[in-house]
Amino acid sequence: MTKYIFVTGGVVSSIGKGIVAASLGRLLKNRGLKVTIQKFDPYINIDPGTMSPYQHGEVYVTDDGAETDLDLGHYERFIDINLNKYSNVTTGKIYSEVLRKERKGEYLGATVQVIPHITDALKEKIKRAATTTDSDVIITEVGGTVGDIESLPFLEALRQMKADVGSENVMYIHTTLLPYLKAAGEMKTKPTQHSVKELRGLGIQPNMLVIRTEEPVEQGIKNKLAQFCDVNPEAVIESRDVEHLYQIPLNLQAQSMDQIVCDHLKLDVPQADMTEWSAMVDRVMNLKKTTRIALVGKYVELPDAYLSVVEALKHSGYANDTAIELDWINANDLTAENAKKLLGQADGIIVPGGFGQRGTEGKIQAIRYAREHDVPMLGICLGMQLTCVEFARHVLGMEKANSFELDPDTAYPIIDIMRDQIDIEDMGGTLRLGLYPCKLKAGSRAAAAYNNQEVVQRRHRHRYEFNNKFRQDFEAAGFVFSGVSPDNRLVEIVELPEKKFFVAAQYHPELQSRPNRPEELYTAFVTAAVKNKNQSL
């Protein structure tokens, strides 16, 4: 029988529900259980694919092509699993599906209501996420906070699950903020008490509290919370601020969180062996070197827009025994005149993805600087496309070369719209999304990075591609197409082999990086940056 764990939040948003859920998932996985995890987002968008990065952060893409919340990146990195489209559910997605069924007459003339139709659809998504992955345990995080009007159908569905599958198969975990008032010199439990009161008013009694705090919590405070919130004192778990996120699973295990969960759900499984994870954390906490990477982007005011890129760089840093120091460079501010000032101290340059014209000329200048000064450079998605544009302009003499996306009237459309995208009008959910194969060129930098594999599978999110009309011109000038689709139609990786490291990929390698298993192309880039730093000393 599948076990269901529901994680809700109270008092304030952004208190780390996703990290708590992911950490618990890692602990349960290390007990030998097959775990999956999903995120409920109560916004009305179908998915975050068309949302501004300034509002939502990055869009995380799954193997099967779902555009999802960035928390799924945390889930995959912590638990080391590949999630699917059932792992992110929004209000918009649920209402869209219910209304589509209503139009088809599938409700046989019934009045369509929040209860039972919306709540039934939500419960079906929970169960589908578990069955499609054949999981022993599914953890469902509900975005937002208890008391938000848009969360009510989600919480009602969670309440109903207890009756549907039995109380011994359901556990409710409530995460809240425990504020510390410096003036009074004490922690305040009242916000948590009111949050739990609100949750109980909706028919959900939490079985565990996870309290986010900056200071250590005395047992007396935990006892008070247990008494007023009707949970066992040992089920009041402290989630204190840490230096590194990957410490959190170990901190939760030290408080027997996973054992309490297993006892409640009647799971008789071995203790979690966190030896490898602990060794990884020790390595992270004791890095001996620092490597400086310039990240040139258009959304740098909100680092969450590049969350997976940053994490992948860190993972590859761990493998090289180096911390990554990021210089956040706003592409809008970068010009040929100030490129040396902004980029001259970097050991490596990364140009990540994006959409639209703003900032593209600055990114092109960053790529040009990397090429002309032989600074290790990694381009991702739009960064790969602009790598091709830069080469066309400044090496091949195609002065007005551009992407069709950025200039439909360009005489040299180095990057063109994909053929199967030409007649598509909708923006949402219509990109080339998900896992696709990439055939590697033997002897190339890319092939070496991937241990000379012939084919790798990586996740994509794009609508434009390299225009093959220009392929011979590029190759004649020494530009290498080191990764292509198996049918040789789509360019996936480009490089200049004579440089220290000058590689760009159409796909998003960062989406498959893990703290204990860094993505190979990122690792090759960071390794080159470390070597470049050493040569400059």
Swiss-Prot record:
UTP binds at S13, K188, T189, K190, P191, T192, Q193, K224. PROSITE patterns: GATASE_TYPE_1. One of its GO terms (cellular component) is cytosol. GO terms for molecular function: ATP binding; CTP synthase activity; glutaminase activity; identical protein binding; metal ion binding. L-glutamine binds at Y54, G354, L382, G383, M384, Q385, E405, R463. Coiled coil: none annotated. SUPFAM superfamilies: Class I glutamine amidotransferase-like, P-loop containing nucleoside triphosphate hydrolases. ATP binds at S14, I15, G16, K17, G18, I19, D71, R240, D241, V242. The active site is at C381 (nucleophile), H508, E510. Keywords: ATP-binding, Glutamine amidotransferase, Ligase, Magnesium, Metal-binding, Nucleotide-binding, Pyrimidine biosynthesis. InterPro entries: Class_I_gatase-like, CTP_synthase, CTP_synthase_N, GATASE, GATase1_CTP_Synthase, P-loop_NTPase. Transmembrane segments: none annotated. It catalyses: UTP + L-glutamine + ATP + H2O = CTP + L-glutamate + ADP + phosphate + 2 H(+); L-glutamine + H2O = L-glutamate + NH4(+); UTP + NH4(+) + ATP = CTP + ADP + phosphate + 2 H(+). Mg(2+) binds at D71, E141. Residues 292-535 form the Glutamine amidotransferase type-1 domain. Residues 1-267 are annotated as: Amidoligase domain. Catalyzes the ATP-dependent amination of UTP to CTP with either L-glutamine or ammonia as the source of nitrogen. Regulates intracellular CTP levels through interactions with the four ribonucleotide triphosphates. Homotetramer. CTPSs have evolved a hybrid strategy for distinguishing between UTP and CTP. The overlapping regions of the product feedback inhibitory and substrate sites recognize a common feature in both compounds, the triphosphate moiety. To differentiate isosteric substrate and product pyrimidine rings, an additional pocket far from the expected kinase/ligase catalytic site, specifically recognizes the cytosine and ribose portions of the product inhibitor. Belongs to the CTP synthase family. This is CTP synthase. It comes from Streptococcus equi subsp. equi (strain 4047).
